Amino acid sequence: MNAKALYKKKALRDRRKLRIKSKLLGDKLRPRVSVFRSNRYFYAQAIDDVKQSTITHIDGRKMGFKNTQEDAKKLGALFAEELKKAGIERAVYDRNGYLYHGVVAAFAESLRENGIVL
């Protein structure tokens, strides 16, 4: 891709991100689960927007998981355990401007399968 196409792609994602985030709000009882995917790894965190703090997070890079659907399902199961340890049963899913497809969808489905209501 040339520079102009990359700029447009990032600008469109940023617009989607702002539009989504304007409608979502997480608190201590129902935090916002924000995901980030790079070309190689996958990350997620539970955010309390009222206090502007992270409740818990998971880092696929440190755990040796790649950016694949199978690894996203495993990360989702581990992250669901972390949320349950923190006393969280419900959350708001923030896909962070990414399309609900592939690893982003697999992670969300894994959270749902492991008892987190999104």
From Swiss-Prot:
Query: What are the TM regions of this chain, as residue ranges?
Result: none
| Free-text function comment from the UniProt entry | This is one of the proteins that bind and probably mediate the attachment of the 5S RNA into the large ribosomal subunit, where it forms part of the central protuberance.
Determine if Ribonucleoprotein is one of this entry's keywords: yes
* Subunit structure, as described in the record: Part of the 50S ribosomal subunit; part of the 5S rRNA/L5/L18/L25 subcomplex. Contacts the 5S and 23S rRNAs.
> Which Pfam families does the annotation name?
Ribosomal_L18p
What GO terms in the biological process aspect are recorded for it?
translation
Cellular component terms, GO, for this chain's entry?
cytosolic large ribosomal subunit
Alphabetical list of NCBIfam families matching this protein: L18_bact
The family classification in the record reads: Belongs to the universal ribosomal protein uL18 family.
Keyword annotations of the record: Ribonucleoprotein, Ribosomal protein, RNA-binding, rRNA-binding
**Superkingdom, natural source:** Bacteria
- Name of the protein described by the UniProt record: Large ribosomal subunit protein uL18
SUPFAM superfamilies in UniProt: Translational machinery components
Q: Which PANTHER family match?
A: 39S RIBOSOMAL PROTEIN L18, MITOCHONDRIAL, LARGE RIBOSOMAL SUBUNIT PROTEIN UL18M
